[in-house]
């Protein structure tokens, strides 16, 4: 019996190009003004985005790389097993990620499985993403409230300075979440203007770090919520190393804080 050959639809090169450009432009135009812009598509940013989008908030993630997930793909030392301390495994259960309790309160999962599930969950919830888009600056309004971000294409930063006359563009939002990890890039732009003081992250101390990072996740400045390792940098908290429970729970807490801020603005 001869196998029937697949016959693809008749589509030309111009049709493909128009589809890419048209749909990108349509989506980008919608998200030039968002409820929440999240800078950084690592585990805490993705978690915050998933929670907010699931509540119906227009949520846009800005990611400088051409991939999402940050360090969530690899648990540490180039090994792709990641650890989560209880109660963080409850998020893995929510996402449908298999994990094993290897000692009391310490769970291990496959990094690629966990990361891909989180990315899919964020996308399924309705989060939209601008990849290869680098954060450049903040937008401020009355009272120095953060009201958006200034962005550019990531490859622009690699161009020789003498030919890099490529102005960035601005995106507006009601709330911005800094999920840029240890760099705390959004918070540091406020610091450059004397509007916020960051301390810098401390040395590794897993047991102290995770509790403190979730506890301190919140609004660091009007319109700006910090989550994940950016919290450590802003408040001088210990780093946690290759364990991810606090990243996930910090993202959830950031979403609650942002949602409360949006509700207050609506009033």
Model-derived regions, located:
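Glycine-rich Rossmann-fold phosphate-binding loop(s) that bind the pyrophosphate
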Residues: 40-44
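Conserved N-terminal glycine-rich FAD pyrophosphate-binding loop of Rossmann-like flavoproteins
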Residues: 9, 64-88
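Glycine-rich FAD pyrophosphate-binding loop
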Residues: 37, 53-73
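Extreme N-terminal leader/targeting segments of oxidoreductases
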Residues: 1-36, 153-156, 202-206, 211, ...
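Short FAD-binding loop at a beta-strand-to-alpha-helix junction that anchors the flavin cofactor
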Residues: 218-239
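Short hydrophobic core segments
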Residues: 37-39, 62, 169-181
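A conserved FAD-binding loop/helix module that cradles the flavin
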Residues: 234-266
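Feature captures the FAD/FMN-dependent oxidoreductase FAD-binding
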Residues: 96-176, 185
């Amino acid at each position: 019996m001869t196998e029937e050959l697949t016959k693809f639809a008749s589509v030309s090169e111009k049709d493909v190009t128009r589809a890419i450009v048209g749909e990108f432009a349509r989506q980008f135009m919608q998200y030039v003004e968002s409820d929440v812009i999240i800078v950084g598509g690592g585990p805490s940013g993705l978690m915050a985005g998933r929670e907010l989008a699931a509540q119906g908030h227009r949520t846009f993630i800005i990611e400088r790389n051409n991939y999402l997930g940050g360090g969530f793909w690899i648990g540490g030392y180039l090994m792709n097993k990641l650890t989560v301390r209880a109660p963080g495994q409850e998020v893995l259960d929510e996402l449908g990620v298999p994990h094993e309790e290897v000692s009391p309160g310490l769970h291990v999962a496959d990094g690629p499985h966990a990361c891909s599930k989180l990315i899919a969950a964020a996308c399924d919830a309705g989060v939209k993403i601008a990849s290869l888009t680098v954060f450049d600056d903040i937008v401020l309004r009355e009272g120095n409230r953060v009201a958006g971000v200034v962005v550019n294409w990531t490859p622009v930063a690699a161009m020789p300075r003498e030919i890099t006359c490529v102005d960035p563009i601005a995106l507006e939002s009601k709330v911005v979440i800094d999920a840029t990890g240890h760099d705390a890039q959004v918070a540091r732009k406020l610091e450059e203007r004397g509007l916020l003081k960051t301390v810098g992250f401390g040395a590794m101390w897993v047991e102290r770090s995770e509790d403190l990072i979730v506890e301190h996740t919140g609004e660091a400045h009007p319109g700006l919520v910090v989550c994940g390792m950016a919290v450590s940098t802003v408040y001088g908290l210990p780093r946690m190393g290759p364990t991810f429970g606090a990243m996930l729970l910090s993202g959830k807490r950031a979403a609650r804080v942002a949602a409360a801020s949006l509700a207050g603005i609506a009033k």
